[in-house]
Structure formats: structure tokens, C-alpha cells
């Protein structure tokens, strides 16, 4: 049984012209001199490509050719721009009425709801989407929203859910994302109706999910190619979808939310005022907030790395970041980070790992991943690794796991590799 992830909704009509891309082509039978010629067609020295017999026809013909060529080029550029303007990849500033209607005046069943956002699943312009309603951290006008959308919607990665566009009304923004069929990672690890069951019951599915998330976050931080480095600011197991397909993969939800809601603006760096401390409480999620984020409320790449470290420990242990147990009539907080630190320091990683994996995993790789998670959770943000390095490290451990799985392939799936007591 699948249980799905969280989201929000709203609109304004206006399509944004994307950046122009080049189209180039050449015929296979062209000589090298012809290819050099084609590169200089629009050069001020255009006469260099004309043969001696053509040159004899005079400069008037050459000028006529250049003028016609220029007109043709302008016409082609205009046609391409019009075509691109209609492509589905374009970000949309939806009209608020569209979202209001699609969500049945916001009376439709909520897809999910948290203290900071509400989400609906609906159909807009024939597309199955999730609309997320969030409050702005600061006022933003339509022009600025369009400019930010234009940048974010040009990002594409298999480990990110696609942002289609947005709308705004009052102090709220409504973000429209593609709907992805699957379940959030938290529910995959701990099914609310059956905590002893997990769809991620084998080692390769776990490390695949970890690799997908790491690569997606690395893309957000370092590889969008848009001359801007983004911060996610909402990394947690409930914001990651495990797709329902032949192979289990992970997609990070909410990319662009922090940027579009003004959560990453430097102008929002808090003082010692009371309002800033309230922002930390509302915008952060307990168990995923780095120490510096808890004290300042300012999101950074390093606070994202910290949150990823928590998610990695969840994947390995199957446990929640924070939970409470009763002890002598009092509630005692149990921290996954503290339990992991004890296990790593005492050499007890195998006892700490999720029992539902039945010890069928490469212990050395599991310990390396646990230590990597703790590196991401260093209290000093400067000592935390960059996501590019983390993603590369997990990719190598994934390959090691593949080799281990191939060697152990002849064993039954419920065979326990280690016979030693936990």
C-alpha cells in the first residue's frame, strides 16, 4: 500500500520567453573548406567565402545576399522564439482563478498539510499536478516571481520533481509541481499501518535511494549550470518521493520553494529579535536543523548537507530522527544522531542497522556510509563535506555494493550473511 508525499497551489497567466538555444547542422559530404566557409557567412569579412567566379559578379550581389541572409536569420530567430514560448517546459505564471477552480475553491481533500504548507492534487491545463500553498517570507511582485521562475524551471534532473510554475495571492505563493506516483521516504521506511514492513527491504534499494538523493542535492548546489547556486532548505524524509515503478528511485520534492518564498534572501538574516526566533521554529523541522540554522534561521549549503546526513542515517537504520520514550514516568528524547555516534565509536554499527535488512548487506560499506553521515552532521559547518564529494563517495560505495550483491547472488534472499550475535 502506497502513501503519498506532501505539496501546495495558485496561478497567473503569462508565459516567459526562455533563453534561446542554438541549432546547428552540417552535411556529411561537405569539404573542410566548405565547413570553414559556413562559419564566416555572417562575418564582416563575408567575401572570403566567395569563389573567384562569383566575386566577378560585383559587390551589389554580395550586399543583396547579406541583406537577405540577415532577414532570413531574424525571421528564423522569431519563429524559434515563438515555438519555444509554447513548449511545456516554460514556467507559467498561473492565473489565480485556475488554481481556485482546480482545487474546488480549496475545498477539495487536502493531499497533505503541515504547519507551513498545504497541498492539493488536481488537474490544471490537462496535467496531473500538486499545488502547494506557502506563505511568503517577504513581499514579491509578479515580475520578480517570473524572473525567479524562469531560472528555476530551466533546471532538469531525474532526482528532482519538476516545477511547472506558480501563482500568488495576498501573502501566499502557490507552487505547481508535476505529480509523481509513489510514497514519501518516511512512510517507506516506517509504514504507519505496519511498522515492521518496508518496501525498501534489500540493501541495494537503500543505497540506490541514498545515491539518488545525493546526486539530486549535488545538482541543486553545484550543477544547474544557471550561474546561480541554489539552497533547498527542506531536505527531510517526508520531502523525498520513492517512485512507484519497476525500480525504486528517489525524487526530491520542493526544489525552488526556498528561492521563490524568499527564504534564502540575505536581507532576511535575523537579528536577535523575537521574530527571527519564531521564524526558525516555523520554517525548520525538528531533527533536521543544523546547530547554526537553529541559532540564526539562515539556510546555507552546509545546513542542507546536515539535513542530508540525517536522511542518510534514517535510510540505514530505519529510525526517525527524533522520538520519545517513557522512562520512570517521564518522556525521554531519543536522538538518532546520538545513537549513531555511539554505534560508530563503539564498533556497533551492525547492531544499529535496520534489522529488517536481515544482515544481508556488506558490513564494511554500511559502516562507511554511517561514518559519512556523521561527517555531514559535524557541528562545525566548515568541516562538513561538499555535496559533490558526498555524491561521488556514495556512488563508489554503490558500485562496491553491486559487486558484493553479485558475489552473494546465489544465496537465498532471507539468508543472514553474518552468523554472529548482534
Spans of model-derived segments:
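Short beta-strand micro-motifs within the conserved protein kinase catalytic domain, predominantly
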Residues: 162-173, 181-182
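C-terminal lobe substrate-recognition/regulatory segment of protein kinase catalytic domains
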Residues: 337-382
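Activation segment/activation loop of eukaryotic-type protein kinase catalytic domains
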Residues: 236-287
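Protein kinase catalytic-loop region centered on the HRD/HxD motif
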Residues: 216-230
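Structural motif in protein kinase domains
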Residues: 180-196, 320, 348
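Intrinsically disordered, low-complexity cytosolic regulatory tails
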Residues: 1-93, 104, 119, 128-140, ...
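Conserved catalytic-loop aspartate of Hanks-type protein kinases
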Residues: 304
Amino acid at each position: 500500500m502506497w502513501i503519498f508525499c506532501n505539496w501546495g497551489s495558485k496561478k497567473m497567466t503569462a508565459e516567459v520567453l526562455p533563453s534561446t538555444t542554438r541549432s546547428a547542422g552540417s552535411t556529411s559530404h561537405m569539404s573542410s573548406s566548405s565547413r570553414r566557409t559556413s562559419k564566416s557567412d555572417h562575418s564582416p569579412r563575408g567575401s572570403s567565402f566567395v569563389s573567384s567566379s562569383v566575386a566577378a559578379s560585383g559587390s551589389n550581389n554580395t550586399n543583396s545576399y547579406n541583406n537577405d541572409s540577415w532577414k532570413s536569420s531574424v525571421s528564423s530567430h522569431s519563429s524559434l522564439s515563438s515555438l519555444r514560448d509554447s513548449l511545456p517546459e516554460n514556467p507559467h505564471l498561473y492565473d489565480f482563478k485556475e488554481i481556485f477552480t482546480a482545487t474546488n475553491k480549496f475545498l477539495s481533500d487536502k493531499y497533505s498539510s503541515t504547519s507551513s504548507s498545504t497541498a492539493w492534487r488536481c488537474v490544471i491545463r490537462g496535467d496531473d499536478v500538486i499545488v502547494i500553498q506557502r506563505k511568503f517570507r517577504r513581499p514579491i511582485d509578479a515580475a520578480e516571481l517570473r524572473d525567479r521562475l524562469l531560472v528555476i524551471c530551466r533546471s532538469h534532473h531525474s532526482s528532482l520533481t519538476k516545477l511547472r510554475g506558480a501563482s500568488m495571492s495576498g501573502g501566499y505563493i502557490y507552487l505547481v509541481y508535476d505529480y509523481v506516483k509513489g510514497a514519501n521516504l518516511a512512510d517507506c521506511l516506517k509504514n504507519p499501518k505496519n511498522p515492521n514492513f518496508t518496501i525498501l527491504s534489500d540493501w541495494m534499494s537503500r543505497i540506490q535511494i541514498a545515491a539518488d538523493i545525493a546526486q539530486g542535492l549535488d545538482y541543486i548546489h553545484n550543477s544547474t549550470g544557471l550561474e546561480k547556486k541554489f539552497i533547498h532548505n527542506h531536505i527531510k524524509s517526508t520531502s523525498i518521493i520513492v517512485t512507484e515503478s519497476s525500480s525504486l528511485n528517489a525524487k526530491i520534492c520542493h526544489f525552488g520553494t526556498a528561492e521563490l518564498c524568499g527564504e534564502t534572501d540575505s536581507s532576511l538574516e535575523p537579528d536577535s529579535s523575537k521574530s527571527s526566533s519564531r521564524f526558525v521554529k516555523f520554517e525548520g523541522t525538528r531533527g533536521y536543523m543544523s546547530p547554526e540554522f537553529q541559532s540564526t534561521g539562515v539556510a546555507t549549503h552546509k545546513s542542507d548537507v546536515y539535513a542530508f546526513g540525517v536522511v542518510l542515517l534514517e535510510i540505514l537504520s530505519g529510525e526517525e530522527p527524533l522520538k520519545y520514550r517513557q522512562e520512570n514516568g517521564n518522556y525521554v528524547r531519543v536522538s538518532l544522531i546520538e545513537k549513531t555516534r555511539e554505534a560508530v565509536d563503539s564498533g556497533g554499527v551492525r547492531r544499529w542497522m535496520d534489522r529488517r535488512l536481515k544482515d544481508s548487506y556488506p558490513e564494511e560499506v554500511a559502516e562507511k556510509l554511517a561514518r559519512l553521515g556523521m561527517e555531514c552532521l559535524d557541528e562545525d559547518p566548515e568541516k562538513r563535506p561538499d555535496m559533490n564529494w558526498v555524491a561521488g563517495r556514495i556512488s563508489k560505495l554503490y558500485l562496491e555494493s553491486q559487486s558484493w550483491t553479485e558475489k552473494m547472488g546465489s544465496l537465498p534472499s532471507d539468508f543472514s550473511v553474518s552468523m554472529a550475535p548482534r
